[in-house]
């Protein structure tokens, strides 16, 4: 009964929007190689955490974009009498990569386990309910699940600008400044995801056709993953302050 509104998956083919999926695959792969190169020679374990997490983010995203571009990560869902193309691998990507992005931010801010668990719990709930929205077979149900997912996003952003930002203010000024830049980037980009969803084919409004919807998600993904990682890992001196937050008195 609870899953009655979910449509069974059907085979689907990738259309002309595949160009954006291949660009996403290449972009994420290049980002991964860049981060691996930046991480060579880093010996401090705390600094290595940032490199490892960020490399996994773009590696997972590259694999999921490849899955979508080659037609594996796509299905069709019947909504009324219309077949919608749904890239389910996008949700698999987000399910793994967005918690890792939040973990990067949390480590930078020096958050405790409760704050990290709250952020990741809200994030997984947000992505899960978003996936249910995408796979639902009635327009009203899709919008309802989108609203629930968006509510989880707002709650997550509330914790991000509240508790996590308070933690960051207790760090060294340059660490707090870097956190602020990355936090603002995440807020701006993540807020656009539900907007693109509701305006695109998945939101059933169809103001954005699938071709441009796919392009928009690709640009957001590259900015939120590769762009985020570039800003974070270029600030090696700041990461050194995170690794050694206090200096021994001389």
From Swiss-Prot:
Classification via InterPro entries: Arc/bac/fun_rhodopsins (IPR001425), Rhodopsin_retinal_BS (IPR018229)
Residues the record marks as site: Primary proton acceptor: 93
Transmembrane segments: 19-37, 52-70, 87-104, 116-135, 143-162, 181-199, 213-232
Modified residues annotated as N6-(retinylidene)lysine in this record: 225
Top-level taxon of the source organism: Archaea
Compartments (UniProt record): Cell membrane
An MF annotation (GO) of this entry: photoreceptor activity
Function: Light-driven proton pump.
Protein name: Bacteriorhodopsin
Species of origin: Haloterrigena sp. (strain arg-4)
Record gene name: bop
């Amino acid at each position: 009964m609870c899953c009655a509104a979910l449509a069974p998956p059907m085979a689907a083919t990738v259309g002309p929007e595949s160009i954006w999926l291949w660009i996403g695959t290449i972009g994420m792969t290049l980002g991964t190689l860049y981060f691996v190169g930046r991480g060579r020679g880093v010996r401090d374990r705390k600094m290595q955490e940032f490199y490892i997490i960020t490399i996994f983010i773009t590696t997972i995203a590259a694999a999921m974009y490849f899955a979508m571009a080659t037609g594996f990560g796509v299905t069709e869902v019947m909504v009324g009498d219309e077949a919608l193309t749904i890239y389910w691998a996008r949700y698999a990507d987000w399910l793994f990569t967005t918690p890792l992005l939040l973990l990067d931010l949390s480590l930078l801010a020096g958050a405790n386990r409760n704050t990290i668990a709250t952020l990741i719990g809200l994030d997984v709930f947000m992505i899960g309910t978003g996936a249910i929205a995408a796979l639902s077979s009635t327009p009203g149900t899709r919008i309802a699940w989108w609203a629930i997912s968006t509510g989880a996003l707002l709650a997550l952003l509330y914790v991000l600008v509240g508790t996590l930002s308070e933690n960051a203010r207790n760090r060294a000024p340059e660490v707090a400044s870097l956190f602020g830049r990355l936090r603002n980037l995440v807020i701006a980009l993540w807020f656009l995801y539900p907007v693109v969803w509701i305006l695109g084919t998945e939101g059933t409004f169809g103001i954005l056709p699938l071709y441009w919807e796919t392009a928009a998600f690709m640009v957001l993904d590259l900015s939120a993953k590769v762009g985020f990682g570039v800003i974070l890992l270029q600030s090696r001196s700041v990461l050194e302050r995170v690794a050694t937050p206090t200096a021994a008195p001389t």
